[in-house]
Amino acid sequence: MRCVVLFMVSCLLIVLLINHFEEVEAQKWKECNLRDIFPGKCEHDANAKLRCKEDIAKNFRPSRPFECDCQTFDQGRICYCKKCLV
């Protein structure tokens, strides 16, 4: 009987902890729409998006950008990110 109660309490604690971490994780991501202009051109590969993510992260601290994209124009490239960890 004691083992059953301990098992049930353990399961309840695990469920509560998992639920708490899911709520905390959901609150961290915010829509941020960060944009900035940088020198150079976009290469159409994963490196261009990563470079944009790194460049915007340097300019907009403490936000950590996510879902970034790059567009080339005459004077350089426009980087924009849709979501951020704050």
From Swiss-Prot:
Q: Which GO terms describe its biological process?
A: rejection of self pollen; signal transduction
Which protein family is it in? Belongs to the DEFL family.
- Work out whether the entry's keyword set contains Secreted: yes
| Alphabetical UniProt keywords | Disulfide bond, Secreted, Self-incompatibility, Signal
Q: What is this protein called?
A: Defensin-like SRCA-homolog protein
Q: What is the lineage of its organism?
A: Eukaryota, Viridiplantae, Streptophyta, Embryophyta, Tracheophyta
Known role: Involved in male-mediated self-incompatibility.
InterPro entries attached to this UniProt entry = SCRL (IPR010682)
Signal peptide coordinates: 1-26
